[in-house]
From Swiss-Prot:
Protein family (similarity comment): Belongs to the peptidase S45 family.
Catalysed transformations (reactions): an N-acyl-L-homoserine lactone + H2O = L-homoserine lactone + a carboxylate
Keywords: Hydrolase, Periplasm, Quorum sensing, Signal, Zymogen
Residues that make up the propeptide removed upon maturation: 194-216
Subunit: Heterodimer of an alpha subunit and a beta subunit processed from the same precursor.
Induction: Up-regulated under iron starvation conditions.
Designated name of the protein: Acyl-homoserine lactone acylase PvdQ
Length: 762
């Protein structure tokens, strides 16, 4: 596969491409920001211009998360193995070696330079200020809130590092899900990378399938016809990782007379990603659109390193990348690796599915690799005045990478937009170009040997090869719009969105979270803010409504079956919730549903496109074969739970926790697969389930006369550093489901009893 190792010696240990904290870096001047921190460490940053605003953002973020950002920059630079060795994983669960190779390829100098050149002056100034503010904090850091101080990877940062993080974010919906596959791509007969075993690719595929759940969301925008006060109302409930490069951070940004926006941002971004302003609130949910396509290459029979397009033989480009790996003796060795690229994009290999053999190979084209507008897009959204203005800004720039946008404004408008960067293929070409076998497995794959299957170009699109805004779903309503990571189809059942390219949106069964939301939103009764809040805090397991009555019937029919006794008793006592005091029946139910989902024909009422809100429903116990399979599924689930040692009287809050230091904080919520609106992802760790993702930043915004009223919290707290006073404070609030007022006006901010002020200049 073209990987080779070269010893670089002890000198390499001392040389780094990131400068140390104390390095004599050129420092910008004329920087100024005022920061006010309110309760729970939320910074309210005011500056006269973008450079000063970025300066304040970088400083405030470093105070809470310097170690997190520094490590994520190490990842985005492809330097994990240099500092941590080849063993270990990134926050995205990628092994260090393939992670480094992938990001060294993704963030090559020419790509960063092109990205920087495409930025507006305002965005450049935000980035320059951010880097300067972060570096200032590092120069002053005393270790009180920076536990990694003194580590060689905690370094001063440059604007290029922030671009690396941005590009990493961009490809989350595309080639980033294929990092292992890109690293493993090698011609037939070439040496294979040792880390590319079949098991590794099963894990990689599972990671890709989990993308929409772990980076999912719920969103509801209510308009004047349904809100109790006749104005707009928005619930933002994004489900994101609780650590790493996708960990949200609360902040409030102000440039007097030009900008006043509050919400949450991802690490390294000098903009608010989800938030609200004086007259507008917006949020995002991961969409179902395709943001990449695979291309099956017909290889030249004479040479598997060449491929055919319209009968012409073209050579694969070999792109060499190099990384450094720290050995057990502390010495660095240089590893070189070849990435193979076609006119469509890099080659990828998944054994048994996307193979590179003598006749064919697969390439991947990611639409967001050419999306240089993403930062400009969010900064533009931050300045939008109402729903109509936001829509114009999004449709003009087309810089949203892989999410839907939902918004509500003071005038009572509710908006849904499936406006993201999506490949464009003219409808008449899709039947001939698509590869049905892979499409059926959820992989948008096209024929690469026919140039007509290359992405179509429309002059109305903001980027060559993407779908123009006019051909993407938009719905403006005065009652409501909602989304929980389903397609655009049933955003509001009264106005189905249909007839779009299969790359954009398809009419497929909606998930249980959306069914739960729509069950609460149907009707004409006025909706109060409390109603939306309770949809989250109720922690109701919607799938139990569809399945549990029949499951308990099966229990009654098999009362003498010892293997089912404990499970049936727990299920009978369960409250159909994922609350802290919910019983162990929820554990049995989850394990059962994982097996039930694999059964064919087990639903009493299968999905019916004419009744999408009511189906599927029930278990077909009247069919003997189904009854037998379901009984076995429950018995297997019971055996798994009982083997884990969970006591009969265990509560959900005893099992699902977030560990902070030596203490465990009980966390409500559960797997969104089962219709828990407060979706929480947790993994087994010893005798408990440790939360790794799910509900993150919450905002519920209304628009009374005196200004926006927002309630919410940041579930995992502002700081990722154990030494910070804001490492666990909001997590405890989340455990108790105590949403807080988010202070927006100067009056609210200055009245906060925990107010702290700081002015920084240089």
């Amino acid at each position: 596969m073209g990987m080779r190792t070269v010893l670089t010696g002890l000198a390499g240990m001392l040389l780094g491409s990131m400068m140390p904290v104390q390095a004599d870096m050129p420092r910008p001047t004329g920087l100024a920001a005022d920061i006010r921190w309110t309760a729970y460490g939320v910074p309210h940053i005011r500056a006269k211009d973008e450079r000063g605003l970025g300066y304040g953002i970088g400083y405030a973020y470093a105070r809470d998360n310097a170690c997190l950002l520094a490590e994520e920059i190490v990842t985005a630079r492809g330097e994990r193995a240099r500092y941590f060795g080849s063993e270990g994983k990134s926050s995205a669960e990628l092994d260090n070696l393939p992670s480094d190779i992938f990001y060294a390829w993704l963030n090559q100098p020419e790509a960063l330079q092109a990205f920087w050149q495409a930025q507006t002056p305002a965005v450049r100034q935000l980035l320059e200020g951010y880097a300067a503010g972060f570096n200032r904090f590092l120069r002053e850091a005393d270790g009180k809130t920076t536990s990694c101080l003194g580590q060689p990877w905690l370094r001063a940062i440059a604007t290029d590092d922030l671009l690396r993080l941005t590009r990493r974010l961009l490809v989350e919906g595309g080639v980033g899900q294929f990092a292992d596959a890109l690293v493993a791509a090698a011609p037939p007969g070439a040496e294979k990378v040792a880390l590319s075993g079949e098991q590794a690719f099963q894990v990689a595929e599972q990671r890709r399938q989990r993308f929409r759940l772990e980076r999912g969301s719920n969103a509801i925008a209510v308009g004047s016809e349904r809100s109790a006060d006749g104005k707009g109302m928005l619930l933002a409930n994004p489900h994101f990782p609780w650590n790493g490069a996708m960990r949200f951070y609360q902040m409030h940004l102000t440039i007097p007379g030009r900008l006043d926006v509050m919400g949450a941002s991802l690490p390294g971004l000098p903009v608010v990603n989800i938030g609200f302003s004086r007259h507008l609130a917006w949020t995002h949910t991961v969409d179902t659109s395709s943001h990449f396509t695979l291309y099956r290459l017909a290889l030249d029979p004479k040479d598997p390193r060449r491929y055919l397009v319209d009968g012409r033989s073209l050579p694969l480009e070999e792109k060499s990348v190099a990384i450094e790996v720290r050995g057990a003796d502390g010495k660095l060795s240089r590893v070189e690796h070849k990435v193979y690229q076609s006119i469509y994009g890099p080659l990828v290999v998944w054994p048994g599915k996307l193979d590179w053999n003598r006749s064919e190979a697969y390439a991947l084209r990611d639409a967001n690799l050419e999306n240089t507008r993403v930062l400009q897009q969010w900064y533009s959204i931050n300045q939008a005045s109402d729903v109509a203005d936001l829509r114009r800004r999004v449709e003009a720039l087309q810089g949203i990478p892989w999410v839907n946008t939902l918004a509500a404004d003071e005038q009572g408008n509710a908006l849904y937009m499936n406006q993201s960067v999506v490949p464009y293929l003219k409808p008449e070409l899709i039947p001939a170009c698509a590869i049905p076998q892979l499409v059926a497995e959820g992989l948008p794959a096209l024929q690469g040997q026919d140039s007509r299957c290359a992405w179509s170009r429309d002059p109305a699109a903001a980027q060559a090869g993407i779908t123009p805004a006019a051909q993407l779903p938009v719905l403006l309503r005065r009652d409501f719009v909602q989304n929980s990571n389903d397609s655009a189809w049933l955003t509001n059942p009264a106005s189905p969105l249909q007839g779009f390219s299969p790359l954009v949106s398809q009419e497929k069964p909606i998930g249980p979270r959306a069914r739960y939301a729509l069950s609460r939103l149907q009707g004409k009764q006025p909706l109060e803010a409390k109603t939306l809040e309770e949809m989250v805090t109720a922690n109701h397991v919607f799938s139990a409504d569809q399945v549990l009555p029949d499951l308990l019937r099966l229990c009654r029919d098999n009362q003498g079956e010892k293997s089912l006794a404990r499970a049936c008793a727990a299920l009978a006592q369960w409250d159909r919730g994922a609350n802290l005091d919910s019983g162990s029946g929820f554990v049995y139910f989850q394990r059962f549903m994982q097996r039930f989902a694999e059964l064919d024909g087990a639903w009493k009422e299968p999905f019916d496109a004419q009744r999408p809100l009511d189906t599927p429903q029930g278990i077909a116990l009247d069919r003997p074969q189904v009854a037998t399979q379901v009984r076995q599924a429950l018995a297997d689930a019971a055996a798994e739970v009982e083997k884990s040692g969970i006591p009969d009287g265990a509560r959900w809050g005893d099992l699902q926790v977030s560990t902070r230091g030596q203490e465990r904080i009980a966390i409500p919520g559960g797997d969104g697969h089962f219709g828990v609106y407060n979706a929480i992802q947790s993994v087994r760790k010893g005798d408990h389930l440790e939360v790794v993702g799910g509900t993150s930043y919450i905002q519920l915004v209304t628009f009374p006369e005196e200004g926006p009223k927002a309630r919410g919290l940041l579930a995992f707290s502002q700081s990722s550093d154990p030494r910070s006073p804001h490492y666990r404070d909001q997590t405890e609030l989340f455990s108790r489901q105590q949403w807080q007022t988010l202070p927006f006006s100067d009056r609210q901010i200055d009245a906060d009893p925990q107010l702290q002020r700081l002015s920084i200049r240089e």
